[in-house]
Amino acid sequence: MKTYAQKASEVQREWYVIDATNQTLGRLATQIATLLRGKHKPTFSPYIDGGDFVIVVNAERIRLTGRKPEQKMYYRHSNYPGGFKAVSFKQLMAKHPERVLRFAVKGMLPKTRLGRQQLTKLKIYAGPKHPHAAQQPKVYEPRPRG
């Protein structure tokens, strides 16, 4: 009996919608990364983009534990002298709440072309509305802790 290897043309994608209200950032991001990579499917293959589309609503209501909302920093550099920028979690949530979750999920995906392709299947919206009703997304309930 031969081992089954999925081809890119055989991939069947689902659309899931996740409500981020009162979800912890890291725990939610790991579940999203699993869906995007397709690791929840029995046909998972690390070199095929077999994951599903994920729509996240209410990204502005995501939370962190402890004192992290004040202490967590996001850094970037423009590659120019003196171009180092730092912004706190609170500041980023006030301006662009969807970027916080995107950064967390991006760090959990492969740092390759495949990872960048998988990240394009993530759609994040700060509020409760999204324009993907035509895809008939299924409501995804994150796994309970414990």
From Swiss-Prot:
UniProt-recorded name of the protein: Large ribosomal subunit protein uL13
UniProt xrefs under Pfam families: Ribosomal_L13
UniProt-listed HAMAP family: Ribosomal_uL13
GO molecular function term, any single one: mRNA binding
Highest taxon above the source species: Bacteria
Source species of the chain: Roseiflexus sp. (strain RS-1)
Gene3D superfamilies reported in the protein's UniProt record: Ribosomal protein L13
Described purpose of this protein according to its UniProt entry: This protein is one of the early assembly proteins of the 50S ribosomal subunit, although it is not seen to bind rRNA by itself. It is important during the early stages of 50S assembly.
A GO term from the CC aspect: cytosolic large ribosomal subunit
Keywords of this entry: Ribonucleoprotein, Ribosomal protein
GO BP of this protein: negative regulation of translation; translation
Residue ranges, annotated region (Disordered): 125-146
Subunit and partners: Part of the 50S ribosomal subunit.
Lineage: Bacteria, Bacillati, Chloroflexota, Chloroflexia, Chloroflexales
